[in-house]
Amino acid sequence: MFELNNFDALQIGLASTEKIREWSRGEVKKPETINYRTLKPERDGLFCERIFGPQKDWECHCGKYKRIRYKGIVCDRCGVEVTKAKVRRERMGHIELAAPVSHIWYFKGIPSRMGLILDMSPRALEKVLYFASYVVLDPKETQLLKKQLLTEKEYREAVDKYGEQNFVASMGAESVKKLLEEIDLEQLSLVLKEDLKNSTGQKKIRIIRRLEVVESFRKSGNRPEWMVIDVIPVIPPDLRPMVQLDGGRFATSDLNDLYRRVINRNNRLKKLLDLGAPDIIVRNEKRMLQEAVDALIDNGRRGRPVTGPGNRPLKSLSDMLKGKQGRFRQNLLGKRVDYSGRSVIVVGPELKMYQCGLPKEMALELFKPFVMKKLVERGLAHNIKSAKRMVERVQAQVWDVLEEVISDHPVLLNRAPTLHRLGIQAFQPVLVEGRAIKLHPLSCTAYNADFDGDQMAVHVPLSVEAQSEARFLMLAAHNILKPSDGKPVVVPTQDMVLGSYYLTVEREGAKGEGRYFSFPDEVIMAYQLKQIDINAKIKVKMTKIIDGKYISGIIDATAGKIIFNECVPQDLGFIDRSKPGNEFKLEIDFLVAKKNLGKIINKCYMKHGATKTSIMLDKIKARGYHYSTISGITVSTSDMEVPEAKKRLLSESDAAVDKIEKMYRRGFISEDERYQRVIERWTKTTEDVADELMNNLDKFNPIFMMADSGARGSKSQIKQLAGMRGLMANPSGKIIELPIRASFREGLDVLEYFISTHGARKGNADTALKTADSGYLTRRLVDVSQDVIVREEDCGTYEGYDVSEIKEGNEVIESLSERLTGRYSAEDIIDPNNHQIIVPKNSYMDSKLADRIEASGIKKVKIRSVFTCKSRHGVCSKCYGMNMATAQKIDIGESVGIIAAQSIGEPGTQLTMRTFHTGGVAGSDITQGLPRVEELFEARKPKGLAIVSEVSGTVKMEETKKKRSVSVITDNGEEVTYDIPFGSRIKVSNGDLISAGDEVTEGSVNPHDILRIKGVQGVKNYLLSEVQKVYRLQGVDINDKHLEVVIRQMTRKIKIEESGDTELLPGTMIDIFDFEEENARVEASGGSAAQGRVALLGITKAALATESFLSAASFQETTRVLTDAAIKGKIDPLLGLKENVIIGKLIPAGTGMTRYRSIKINTENEVQENQLEA
């Protein structure tokens, strides 16, 4: 049986006149919509019931047939079929045009498809189509040329010269249609291919462009004359509705106005033709008809747009698809869903990690159908209707039933903006009073939520499958690691950190110091009886059973550490238990700040898994809150003391700056140097004052404790509170050399305050701009990588990718072990010291193995990488390696593309926006932060270009008065010289050995140059390490594999250079796999293969060049993508996520993959158990 939703691919093409008539249920002849008195549709008008179906279910226009029993009858009086009103959403009509018109997409798009196939310029075409010039269709015996343009005057002269019968020339779309009909695609294709062999330069480019269009038509079976329309389809009336507003007026869709103009002009043209009106009038009417149809299809593409009331351009068919409010993005990719609600969130510290508090009334509304069913099952209501009444009146029994319904029904909580997959998690609901949703404090980091009025949305998974997915895959207690770097995302913050810090800090000379206790419980009892201080150093006898024997030993501890260790499993590996004497030590015997908490959680997760970790986290949360309250840590002005040495330091600096000024005035140093020295001096002073301040602070100073524990604030903020604020930047980013001497404790004077406002305002403006930019970057990343899914276990490639540590100067940005963890080796890794194999080929490397490899002194390792994966669609499990979010090997079906895009996009808002100025030297500004990431992913030519050596060799420097130059002398004596522009800093020195692709001057390199010099692997390496540098400098960790996924998508296309015996055209882009396939096919039959080179596309370009036209059209440039796809008759194989969301199928990832589809969830046993219990 043919099912409407059961298809594997989708094809788009041009519609022929016959096809449009086939779709249609009748011709729309009148421009009328509905009768103003009866409010019923006019017959043969734009809302006609005879064409489009009845307005009311099972009721004809005249009212002769009402009720379902007349289903399918066509009324003999009014001609309306008795059927459901829903057909008005699917039945189409048509308008028979009195004269053909061209379709604006194919004539006006860039490049003009109509112009290319006819070999006419778009300008000339426009003149013909809009009745400004004649075009010669058949010159016969005359000296005119075919397709030659004639103005009115030239036409008359030609008629006088040759006579009207001796040649054929006409204007308008009819003449263009005739020319298109005459085209023999097969013949034209052969002619163009011949011409291509003998042409060069611009001519060659033009022929390739023409050939592309001709081949598209030839292969797709579309005919060129279908670009000219004889019949216009009218879309169903319910898709362009007309509704009555209160006050008797009507609101209508713009499309109705546009259709009405077409019908009016068409009818007038018919009438004029019947009357045999003069040519000039008919011509004008035809031109107006052409313009009306243009406006309907794409208003504003040519000339001024047609406007409605208030000078607003009308929304045409193209506008309905485009942009954020268009059909694709508004209705197909993002729908509003039922069974959802939203409310303000408040903190719920009493909740377990997997719970959330749901307000009673909200829960009742969300779970209404479930509650009603249960009420009927229980016999509390006789039927669904009375159950509904009970729920609406909120009777007492309803609450008990609701409790039972939600007891094992997880809900999804989402906070906008959802920047990564942790922005939607599942929780077990707990009913709460009030109207606010309660959120577990540890889930805040993942959601980036706080309780200053944030709102969250709740969604109810309905089907059993959806519920089990929510419970097993999305439960908050399972989402402990961050998918971007595999570090814990649920790290306690603020009060919890402060509490843990307070528990594990030791105080010298506290009450009870040095006392001995015989077991831990005795310590806690002593603390509760106020015998000892919680931070006092004490000795405790610990007893353990080892090999069936009781063994005891005495350890150093504090009451706080004992309390804290009760929360934590004692086998995490912080203490080496194999050493004698270590058996009794507390696992956490150090000061617990925020950093260490992350380590504790990581170790617990690796050792014990998610469930135990979430239990430990809940315990730490409870203790943290309790003891941070008891500690009584508060903030007061007196906690901040201005260091005594500040005065002395300031006056010393003043003297030093005076000295620098004197030197400048005497001409010993330049202005730049003076500025640099003053800045350096004040920076040092600020740091000295800060050091003095930090050294004077007591270890138990509350503000110090907050900063030191990582609960809130930082050293630099303390420095500003009581040290000095230091140097500030002016609005352009240049540092002002007058420092702010005061601290906030002392108070700023007017000038200082004014200088500070620059930075504060710039910060706010930056944040607002950054959010939008970062969001747009994420959207492009998602679009380019959304169809990358793990589709197989092993692609069987022999290639690998060499990794070594990434350095910026002397600083290691990413160590080798970090880059190896969770990857597969591409070859045997051999220890250089004893020549034994550490890791065999194709084996998985965990963090222990990675550390061992690094320790053995190996500098470079070949690993399996997404870069070299040979999977045609998506990647294979071995090339990808570990799933960062679970620390396990990745499962087949995981949508790693989306995860990669989110991991790169989510921290985008933390990157800076600024361009650093290097003391006013023009041309040497380096782009950093977000703009730099964007520049790399879009493969743009960067600002501040560095000069790159094209060859390998030895450096020779020359400097004359007029210019500086650097030469590179190759091994065979060739010399390549580069002139260095003024103001650039040279990176190499005389006699250096450099290799091709190395930078000669400082700055950023154009990635296309690297592709040319170092090849594909070189450019992939460059992009990866450059993006990593930007993120790491901001303190953001992203695993390499996410960047690899995106960069692989940027280098998937090949630009054909020589076509050989293949069907491929030079200059066109084709997927690497298609390229290899086509070459293999040709070589098998003895032909010569095509030549091409890998092209580097920016993410926007790469997203638009995807196989799927649905995905590309829903991304950007909708009309261009669809025009191109229609001419090529493209088939969308529906492999990515986006396409499947658009057509409403399950996405082919995760449990939606075909290999998992047949899994059934068995609920029978549960049902039986429940019945037995009842």
From Swiss-Prot:
GO terms for cellular component: DNA-directed RNA polymerase complex. InterPro entries: DNA-dir_RpoC_beta_prime (IPR045867), DNA-dir_RpoC_beta_prime_bact (IPR012754), RNA_pol_asu (IPR000722), RNA_pol_N (IPR006592), RNA_pol_Rpb1_1 (IPR007080), RNA_pol_Rpb1_3 (IPR007066), RNA_pol_Rpb1_3_sf (IPR042102), RNA_pol_Rpb1_4 (IPR007083). One of its GO terms (biological process) is DNA-templated transcription. One of its GO terms (molecular function) is DNA-directed RNA polymerase activity. Binds 1 Mg(2+) ion per subunit. It holds the Pfam family RNA_pol_Rpb1_5. Zn(2+) 2 binds at C795, C869, C876, C879. Keywords: DNA-directed RNA polymerase, Magnesium, Metal-binding, Nucleotidyltransferase, Transcription, Transferase, Zinc. Zn(2+) 1 binds at C60, C62, C75, C78. Its EC number is 2.7.7.6. It catalyses: RNA(n) + a ribonucleoside 5'-triphosphate = RNA(n+1) + diphosphate. It is an enzyme of class 2 (transferase). Belongs to the RNA polymerase beta' chain family. DNA-dependent RNA polymerase catalyzes the transcription of DNA into RNA using the four ribonucleoside triphosphates as substrates. NCBIfam families: rpoC_TIGR. The RNAP catalytic core consists of 2 alpha, 1 beta, 1 beta' and 1 omega subunit. When a sigma factor is associated with the core the holoenzyme is formed, which can initiate transcription. This is DNA-directed RNA polymerase subunit beta'. It comes from Clostridium kluyveri (strain ATCC 8527 / DSM 555 / NBRC 12016 / NCIMB 10680 / K1).
